[in-house]
Amino acid sequence: MEMKWFLSKIQDDFRGGKINLEKTQRLLEKLDIRCSYIHVKRIFKDNDRLKQGRITIEEFRAIYRILTHREEIVEIFNAYSENRKILLENNLVQFLTQEQYTTEMSKTIAFEIIQKYEPIEEVRKARQMSLEGFTRYMDSRECQLFKNECRKVYQDMTHPLNDYFISSSHNTYLVSDQLVGPSDLWGYVSALVKGCRCLEIDCWDGAQNEPVVYHGYTLTSKLLFKTVIQAIHKYAFMTSDYPVVLSLENHCSPAQQEIMADNLQTTFGESLLSDMLADFPDTLPSPEALKFKVLVKNKKIGTLKETHERKGSDKRGKVEEWEEEVADLEEEEEEEEKFKESEIFESVLGENQDKETGVKKLSGVTLFKKKKTRKLKIALALSDLVIYTKAEKFKSFQHSRLYQQFNENNSIGETQARKLSKLRAHEFIFHTRKFITRIYPKATRADSSNFNPQEFWNIGCQMVALNFQTPGLPMDLQNGKFLDNGGSGYILKPHFLRESESYFNPSDIKDSMPITLTIRLISGIQLPLTHSSSNKGDTLVIIEVFGVPNDQMKQQTRVIKKNAFSPRWNETFTFIIHVPELALIRFVVESQGLIAGNEFLGQYTLPLLCMNKGYRRVPLFSRMGESLEPASLFVYVWYVR
């Protein structure tokens, strides 16, 4: 029956005789067979018996079988088929219930699957499934590891903003390093498309009274501020309906701050939040209440009540000035690092410096290299656009408990945050329950490298800001975590990071209810080949767990020699995970290297609690986050609490 169907689909393509590689590729696509060109090219060459670059219908049939026949799928099919040829509707229901843990299973669901994936009409009409149809179903999105219910917004979005992890970027305007790399609008567009909800804009005085965006004291190129926010306006809500926060690193003079304020109001219009919401005069609103809104994060003058009373008044030329303490050692170190960078480039940038006092003056903001205060000037017009995201310097947990207001947010550098998280984790978590806290990379990361964000998610930090332009493990974790909740960029924190009565400490887990996770890594499908001349397709897989310190672990398979097309491991791994709500699972595929070390081939990261049980397909992504379809892993997953 399958042979008859197969020949009916391909005969017309061979009426003119043999076909070449390009026509072979097109015919496979016509048959809905996803395949990598590099693998098809090799298989075509192996099956072209006359080595003329053209194949017969029988040779094509052999290629098709190599690409679609997977022994591991045949074994599952035969286990549930009564005659090893056809799955009856009841057989499919049994498989979905017993192996895939499909809840609320019914013949109706089984029938829908048959109608969608069974290609042979007479089998489909009989409400049955052939091996061909079963293979297509097992290779479909419905059988992916990531739960379908996590692909949509399913969490309660009516909690205050501080109850959520918020996808956040650092130096969003950069697409390379921080010293001489280009600034590019693509940095903002790309971040927004990936679901990022907090963007950083580094603002400086520009020529012709136009504020510019670039990495100060360096040779990075410049973008007009108004052009940046126009791009943000276009893409802000393309991926997510939930609020976008513009985190301004404001180095502009008051005059150009007024221009920034005008640009923001003109560009965003009603989308720009410029006053308190009536229902939230003294608490942070929820993502739901702020749908399609843009929030400005910046320094602010006075209270929200005063801002409300000034609404509609003329603010032109009105400026406030005050001295602000540089409260912590890390900030002094970072100012000094910036100061050193400015010395490197001063001949190019033409900055003026007082050699004796070590003071560098920058467009209305004076930074003191050695003193512990700095003077700030802010235009009232810009200040009044800051509502629920007022930037406030972090001084201490005690100071925050006594004086910090609900709408004041802190930004803490990674070095200081790491020290605090290790020494005073409970106080840090108490702080992040009440106040939005942003963690950013240290200034010495001139190459735009990233830290591991997991350690700061573990203590409830809402905005863990990463350099989105830099691929690697940190961005894999970022992308994996924010797959959840429909990729909305907002994930409700676990109850123990929200509730005041909780005494959770990620380094001292008590009274936990661990999950036992079992993963049987069965096989790989069309794994990518590297460009390395030494690559022989010697493949292995590493499974890693990221979460609280006690849950961090990894295990790996043996190496399958000279087979990247269809390696079979059939190895089982078990993990005990104490805090599953914070755990991420990462699959990494590598090619074994004897001299230069293993070579990265692809990876996939996702939250543990977004993992389907049963036989599942694991898609793979490149180092840059691009899909490597049809490359994937085939696994069996089981976990129980």
Curated annotation (Swiss-Prot):
Transmembrane segments: none annotated. Residues 155-299 form the PI-PLC X-box domain. Residues 382-498 form the PI-PLC Y-box domain. It catalyses: a 1,2-diacyl-sn-glycero-3-phospho-(1D-myo-inositol-4,5-bisphosphate) + H2O = 1D-myo-inositol 1,4,5-trisphosphate + a 1,2-diacyl-sn-glycerol + H(+). GO terms for molecular function: calcium ion binding; phosphatidylinositol-4,5-bisphosphate phospholipase C activity. The EF-hand and C2 domains are essential for triggering Ca(2+) oscillating activity and the regulation of PLCZ1 enzyme activity. The X-Y linker region between PI-PLC X-box and Y-box domains may be a target for proteolysis and may play an important regulatory role during fertilization. The production of the second messenger molecules diacylglycerol (DAG) and inositol 1,4,5-trisphosphate (IP3) is mediated by activated phosphatidylinositol-specific phospholipase C enzymes. In vitro, hydrolyzes PtdIns(4,5)P2 in a Ca(2+)-dependent manner. Triggers intracellular Ca(2+) oscillations in oocytes solely during M phase and is involved in inducing oocyte activation and initiating embryonic development up to the blastocyst stage. This is 1-phosphatidylinositol 4,5-bisphosphate phosphodiesterase zeta-1. It comes from Macaca fascicularis (Crab-eating macaque).
